[in-house]
Amino acid sequence: MKTIIVLSYFFCLALSQDYSESNNSTATLCLGHHAVPNGTIVKTITDDQIEVTNATELVQSSSTGKICNNPHRILDGRDCTLIDALLGDPHCDVFQDETWDLYVERSSAFSNCYPYDVPDYDSLRSLVASSGTLEFITEGFTWTGVTQNGGSNACKRGPASGFFSRLNWLTKSGSTYPVLNVTMPNNDNFDKLYVWGVHHPSTNQEQTNLYVQASGRVTVSTRRSQQTIIPNIGSRPWVRGQSGRISIYWTIVKPGDVLVINSNGNLIAPRGYFKMRTGKSSIMRSDAPIDTCISECITPNGSIPNDMPFQNVNKITYGACPKYVKQGTLKLATGMRNVPEKQTRGLFGAIAGFIENGWEGMIDGWYGFRHQNSEGTGQAADLKSTQAAIDQINGKLNRVIEKTNEKFHQIEKEFSEVEGRIQDLEKYVEDTKIDLWSDNAELLVALENQHTIDLTDSEMNKLFEKTRRQLRENAEVMGNGCFKIYHKCDNACIESIRNGTYDHDIYRDEALNNRFQIKGVELKSGYKDWILWISFAISCFLLCVVLLGFIMWACQRGNIRCNICI
């Protein structure tokens, strides 16, 4: 009995040895791509959620919290609005003749002079802000028969009563206020901004005390425009001890044109003009501190980097800024489709190619080879296909930034309550633009992601086809991204396949011979190793059963006698 069992064991071992020797005459070569345990989800045209090995965030969602003073010239308005600095409010004298790229208005800014209003406040503010300068040139206006340099206790300049430094308050001289008619030509080659005003007394008595006439009139004209203002006498809410008001107006005089001022009372006259410039200067309301740093893009929240194509920090920007979108995140695929590697590969340690899964741990390339031959297993990257994919993906982010970054500023849109309908329309237009840009951004990123994934898949297929053309009938496609090579292929042979120097003819006869020796039907299942072992065990078991049956039959015939002793 023991002899039979030992013989069965050696017979099965021989079968196993034959199987191993058969494997030594073949090799397996698989092609695969890089994979990571946890990829990044991106959106493409065809799939809202597809996992890739690597992706770059495209939306800047936070600011530095401070405004950088380089490369843009930042002028901190502190407690002065731009209009107060323009008019020459006593507490804003420090801003005379200042220049800026961006004037930062603070929420703590206040007026500290005679109360005024500007009927076209936003236009004047925007005009001066874009000019980028408060450069003022005094001119020699002749005001005959009136008292100049009027002041008010509401506008202290030091201990004495004062007034806006860029304006001249004209009142009666004695008991008369003659009709004033003054002209001032523009003989220069640039536009001149004249700021003037009309005083609205709180009572009729104040009107006659200051200007004699019961009702004044101010007319300012050029060849292109004319404005006539009649004072509106009446009491208003008290501000800094005054219930009267001054309305501020402005006139632009082109080169070769003439400014004409005509008035019989209530005129707040200009002292000169502001030199207008064209440029990209602007104004922004912000309470962010100004710091010494470098940033091309500024928002009211603070400076932000402009190395991303989109941002959702603030709609108001200045400089070369990412485009504002509603989305909090948009990810650009900068890697290939991610298929995490399966950890269990069977009893024989089988390898699989890109059709089944990706390969983790490929640190030197995106695409590569794994092999299994008589010398063991190995892995190497294919640098050529890796570089081809990287070259096409590199620069993708920069191209998106170039398409979307604004090289100009988005100014604030403000309107008075009277212009509420215009404000609503402007808000609707701005919201629509943001919606369109947000949708366009999402579509652009989805298109780029689709292109990246298709590109990386294509490079994998190119490498597979290149390998198949080299091997020809010397190997068989296994269907999982691998080739079964029907000849002995050591590491040098594998290397020749990888670098493209493999000579098909050298191994042709051996491969054809091995094809005939190997069984025609080959198991293709992923559980081939298990099935082979199970079949092997069953065969050995059946052999033992047959031998035992033969022994029992022989015993019954008397050919073999079995004695059992107790």
Swiss-Prot record:
One GO-annotated biological process of the protein: virion attachment to host cell
Site (Cleavage): R345, G346
Post-translational modification: Palmitoylated.
Disulfide bonds: C30-C482, C68-C293, C80-C92, C113-C155, C297-C321, C489-C493
Cellular localization per UniProt: Virion membrane; Host apical cell membrane
GO CC annotations, alphabetized: host cell plasma membrane; membrane; viral envelope; virion membrane
Keywords: Clathrin- and caveolin-independent endocytosis of virus by host, Clathrin-mediated endocytosis of virus by host, Disulfide bond, Fusion of virus membrane with host endosomal membrane, Fusion of virus membrane with host membrane, Glycoprotein, Hemagglutinin, Host cell membrane, Host membrane, Host-virus interaction, Lipoprotein, Membrane, Palmitate, Signal, Transmembrane, Transmembrane helix, Viral attachment to host cell, Viral envelope protein, Viral penetration into host cytoplasm, Virion, Virus endocytosis by host, Virus entry into host cell
Lipid attachment locations (S-palmitoyl cysteine): C555, C562, C565
InterPro entries found in the cross-reference section: Capsid_hemagglutn, Hemagglutn_HA1_a/b_dom_sf, Hemagglutn_influenz_A, Hemagglutn_influenz_A/B
The name this protein goes by in its record: Hemagglutinin
Organism placement in taxonomy: Viruses, Riboviria, Orthornavirae, Negarnaviricota, Polyploviricotina
